[in-house]
């Protein structure tokens, strides 16, 4: 039996989110609906999740001393990482010494904080199919890797980055220097390390939202949402839709890959397979073939579409799973999402055209409330529900196009 407390009381169930962007904001809302006291942590003030949480804290989460002091002071029941740039070795120490439980596990947070940890786990430890790859610490190593077997075309990404930052496609020798320089500018750390991947000629890519949750007998079960199709431009999601049709054999392989990697990431530092929550498993598909790409041990940006498609969104699934509650991954109706970009570099943004956007049939909006806009910063998302998923895509993109952010 799961017992939950009352917020702002001595018996509250307290959850701390490390990273409070648009995904964290929705997780916080889902937790609050279940009576959980929430603490939103981010590197800057007034982050989206901080706008709705019971408590807010602003620190450099990659600083182990600051992170340890904050967790010891707040004493949350659960710590939920929402981003990669966190002092994950400290989380492992705190989890191992019983100070706090990390979702899904501190080990998963460490392994997925950069592309190297998770790629080596998937390909070298678990033997999952991936694109050919090599890690490089210099421009010369990158050149040698490409010429020595990776070949053209190929994809270069910083080992630590997100939302496509620093990622580019290399079509020939003339592109290598530009790609290296772009990767160095887009990575999260100052030292230069990249992954170069051989290009897979895939038909489409999906996110398979995979949930580890407790069943009625207390044992951990794996649940799958319907496949989420998505379109990425330079590694950054611009639209997603659900369900994406798949050949039954490809879907079976996708689920096998997703379960294999999430089972492993569910193993805590003590060796127990205790990790709970949702994972966004990204996969390439060609016919009946499936390749592992990446995994996030948390809600996924492409999964924003589930706000309009599922009985329980990915955020509600995450909240329920980590609290030990039952989950329902069933589809309610087909739908789609389309990103609303900032379009301008400015602090203090207003949005024109919201009324026009919501006149598109079956649509809804989420405006994230980010205090500063950049031209390519994700400031909101349009959602559309329709019995025909292709029409939902049209409607979502139309609604998104009506919203015009501008400086106040």
UniProtKB/Swiss-Prot annotation:
Record-listed N(1)-(5-phospho-beta-D-ribosyl)glycinamide binding positions: 22-23, 82, 301, 370, 377-378
Catalytic activity: N(1)-(5-phospho-beta-D-ribosyl)glycinamide + formate + ATP = N(2)-formyl-N(1)-(5-phospho-beta-D-ribosyl)glycinamide + ADP + phosphate + H(+)
Gene Ontology terms describing biological process: 'de novo' IMP biosynthetic process
Keyword terms: ATP-binding, Ligase, Magnesium, Metal-binding, Nucleotide-binding, Purine biosynthesis
Biological or metabolic pathway of the protein: Purine metabolism; IMP biosynthesis via de novo pathway; N(2)-formyl-N(1)-(5-phospho-D-ribosyl)glycinamide from N(1)-(5-phospho-D-ribosyl)glycinamide (formate route): step 1/1
Binding residue positions for ATP: 115, 157, 162-167, 197-200, 205
InterPro entries with a match to the protein in the record: ATP-grasp (IPR011761), ATP-grasp_carboxylate-amine (IPR003135), ATP_grasp_subdomain_1 (IPR013815), PreATP-grasp_dom_sf (IPR016185), PurT (IPR005862), PurT/PurK_preATP-grasp (IPR054350), PurT_C (IPR048740), Rudment_hybrid_motif (IPR011054)
Binding positions (Mg(2+)): 282, 294
Record domain ATP-grasp: where: 120-323
Molecular-function annotations in GO: ATP binding; magnesium ion binding; phosphoribosylglycinamide formyltransferase 2 activity; phosphoribosylglycinamide formyltransferase activity
GO CC terms, sorted: cytosol
Record flagged with keyword Nucleotide-binding: yes
Known partners and oligomeric status: Homodimer.
Role noted for this protein: Involved in the de novo purine biosynthesis. Catalyzes the transfer of formate to 5-phospho-ribosyl-glycinamide (GAR), producing 5-phospho-ribosyl-N-formylglycinamide (FGAR). Formate is provided by PurU via hydrolysis of 10-formyl-tetrahydrofolate.
Protein family membership: Belongs to the PurK/PurT family.
Protein name as it appears in the record: Formate-dependent phosphoribosylglycinamide formyltransferase
Upper classification of the organism: Bacteria, Pseudomonadati, Pseudomonadota, Betaproteobacteria, Burkholderiales
